[in-house]
C-alpha cells in the first residue's frame, strides 16, 4: 500500500513508512533515516533519466533507496556496511516487489563510483564523531574513519564525469570536491543539490 501510494505521488507519512521496520530500527528513524519528503526531492533530482543508476552512500535501513525506487524510474543501489541492515532492506524490497533497487553489503571504500550515474549522501560517517546515538554496537566508532571515508568519497566523486549529480543531506561538505557546484538547496539548507562542472 505504501509503495503504491509513493508510485502515485500520494503523500505518505514517515511514521507509516517506518512501521515497515522492526522496532529497534524504527526507533532510529528520526535521527538516521532520510525523511520521505527529502528522499523524494533528492531522488527526483538524481534520477533525471529512466534507469539512471543512483548510489546511496551508507544506505542504513534502505529508506532513501526504497522511496526513490518507488517514486522514480531510476535504479537505486544502497551500499551499507552492516549486514543486518542490508538484510532488512532486501526483505522489504522483496516483500513489496520493488525491482529497481539493490542493496549491497560492503564498505564504501570497496565501491567504485564509476559504476553509477548519481549519488546520495546523508552524512553516513558522522556516527564516527558523534557517538550520542549509535545505530548499534557492531561498528566501533573511530574519528579517523570519518576522515578516511570522507576522503575516499571525495576522491571518487572527483573522477566522475562532468554533469554527475550529487544530493547531500545534513552534510558538513567534507566529502564534496571543488569540481562540484552547488545548484540548489531545500529544507532550510539541509538538502543540497550538486553538479560536477569540471
Language-model-detected regions and their locations in the chain:
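S-adenosyl-L-methionine
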Residues: 1-49
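Conserved SAM-binding strand-loop segment of SAM-dependent methyltransferases
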Residues: 98-106
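Short conserved loop adjoining the S-adenosyl-L-methionine
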Residues: 110-114
Amino acid at each position: 500500500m505504501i509503495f503504491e501510494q509513493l508510485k502515485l505521488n500520494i503523500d505518505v507519512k514517515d511514521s507509516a513508512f517506518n512501521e515497515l521496520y522492526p522496532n529497534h530500527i524504527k526507533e532510529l528513524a528520526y535521527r538516521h533515516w532520510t525523511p520521505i519528503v527529502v528522499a523524494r526531492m533528492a531522488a527526483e533530482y538524481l534520477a533525471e533519466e529512466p534507469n539512471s543508476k543512483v548510489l546511496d552512500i551508507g544506505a542504513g535501513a534502505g529508506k532513501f533507496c526504497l522511496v526513490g525506487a518507488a517514486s522514480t524510474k531510476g535504479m537505486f543501489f544502497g551500499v551499507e556496511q552492516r549486514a543486518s541492515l542490508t538484510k532488512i532492506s532486501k526483505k522489504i524490497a522483496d516483500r513489496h516487489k520493488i525491482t529497481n533497487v539493490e542493496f549491497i553489503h560492503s564498505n564504501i571504500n570497496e565501491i567504485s563510483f564509476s559504476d553509477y550515474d548519481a549519488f546520495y549522501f546523508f552524512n553516513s560517517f558522522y556516527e564516527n564523531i558523534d557517538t550520542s546515538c549509535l545505530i548499534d554496537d557492531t561498528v566501533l566508532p573511530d574519528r579517523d574513519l570519518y576522515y578516511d571515508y570522507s576522503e575516499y568519497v571525495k576522491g571518487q566523486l572527483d573522477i566522475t564525469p562532468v554533469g554527475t549529480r550529487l544530493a547531500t543531506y545534513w552534510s558538513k561538505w567534507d566529502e564534496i570536491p571543488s569540481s562540484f557546484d552547488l545548484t540548489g538547496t531545500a529544507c532550510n539548507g539541509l538538502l543540497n543539490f550538486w553538479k560536477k562542472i569540471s
